[in-house]
Curated annotation (Swiss-Prot):
Converts heme B (protoheme IX) to heme O by substitution of the vinyl group on carbon 2 of heme B porphyrin ring with a hydroxyethyl farnesyl side group. Pfam families: UbiA. NCBIfam families: cyoE_ctaB, PRK04375.1-2. This is Protoheme IX farnesyltransferase. It is an enzyme of class 2 (transferase). Belongs to the UbiA prenyltransferase family. Protoheme IX farnesyltransferase subfamily. Its EC number is 2.5.1.141. One of its GO terms (biological process) is heme O biosynthetic process. One of its GO terms (molecular function) is protoheme IX farnesyltransferase activity. The chain crosses the membrane at residues 32-52, 53-73, 98-118, 120-140, 153-173, 180-200, 226-246, 251-271, 280-300. It comes from Methylocella silvestris (strain DSM 15510 / CIP 108128 / LMG 27833 / NCIMB 13906 / BL2). It catalyses: heme b + (2E,6E)-farnesyl diphosphate + H2O = Fe(II)-heme o + diphosphate.
Length: 316
């Protein structure tokens, strides 16, 4: 395995042009940020108390800003390996559009503003958890786990699972079982989702010296672990129905989606070589995104329908 030892001097020297707003938006990882907003919205809607729309909206903005800050700080620290990996070479820092110091300052200021804002508009317990989430993603995952263990995405995946809890805590002032259920779904979903991509991009991770599971333990072990985690994910995806805050319709949907996820995982497990192995892995990667989106979208839809005046049903 190769390890990164070069400095970021060349990257900084290349960032001689004035960065555009689009470059700073790219630093915030907008795709990841949009998923964070969506899962956080779910956390807001499942809260048992009446949510002031202004507080709810401001809390979502603060959480989104915290996610964006995490992305910017991640790109600042990872700019050396981003310059090596094909899938990340066009990011703002390795592409020379944003200097590392600018990305660091942007991320730090945005992180501070997000935490302070959430504290003032919601409560300081939620703000503290948001601060911990940013710290966990940037320091625990990015600076430590990512480059030191093949279990990086297993432990580090907790950072992506915290937003629904932060949002729930912001509007309800406490954390209860429904919020923890959303955390569990995202936490268990993350490893098979990312390992499916890692099977295809193993060469990229190898060049950058990142000890992903396929590079350290081999693709066969990775396929086995993808299947095991998916078998665990399927029933966990149904917990919103089991514990009573989602409807039987959600239960049926999550059961069906879980079955399709298992089918994809079995195909990944059986396809061991060649282009076919890459194709089934990418299909699972793509479907895993749809899986998570549909689960959370179903919960959001049920909650919104329950709030409409034409609905006589109470929230599940």
């Amino acid at each position: 395995m190769s390890f990164v030892s070069d400095s970021n001097t060349a990257i900084d020297q290349a960032a001689i042009s004035i960065a555009s707003p689009a470059d700073y938006l790219a630093l915030m990882k907008p795709r990841v940020m949009s998923l964070v907003i969506f899962t956080a919205l779910t956390g807001v809607l499942i809260a048992p108390t009446h949510v002031n729309p202004i507080i709810g909206f401001a809390s979502l903005l603060a959480i989104a800003a915290g996610a964006g800050a995490s992305g910017a700080l991640n790109m600042w620290y990872d700019s050396d390996i981003d310059a090596i990996m094909r899938r990340t070479q066009k990011r703002p820092i390795p592409a020379g559009r944003v200097a590392r110091e600018s990305a660091l300052a942007f991320g730090m200021v945005l992180a501070l503003l997000s935490v302070i804002t959430l504290g003032f508009v919601a409560n300081w317990a939620a703000a503290a958890l948001l601060a911990f989430t940013i710290f966990f993603y940037v320091v625990i995952y990015t600076m430590w786990l990512k480059r030191s263990t093949p279990q990086n995405i297993v432990i580090g995946g907790a950072a992506g699972a915290f937003p629904p809890i932060v949002a729930y805590l912001a509007v309800a002032g406490q954390v209860s079982l429904p919020a923890l259920a959303l955390f569990a779904i995202i936490f268990v979903w993350t490893p098979p989702h990312f390992w499916a991509l890692a099977l295809v991009k193993a060469g990229d991770f190898e060049r950058a010296g990142i000890p992903m599971l396929p590079n350290v333990k081999g693709p066969d072990r990775t396929r086995r672990d993808i299947l095991l985690y998916t078998l665990l994910l399927a029933p966990i995806g149904m917990t919103p129905y089991f514990i009573g805050f989602a409807s039987p319709a959600y239960g049926l949907l999550s059961f069906g989606l879980g079955g399709v996820m298992i089918l994809h995982a079995v195909r990944v497990y059986l396809a061991r070589e060649g282009d076919q192995a890459n194709r089934v892995a990418m299909r699972m990667f793509g479907f895993s995104i749809l899986y998570l989106f549909l689960l959370f979208a179903a919960i959001v839809a049920e909650r919104i329908l329950a709030l409409l005046p034409i609905s006589s049903a109470t929230p599940w």
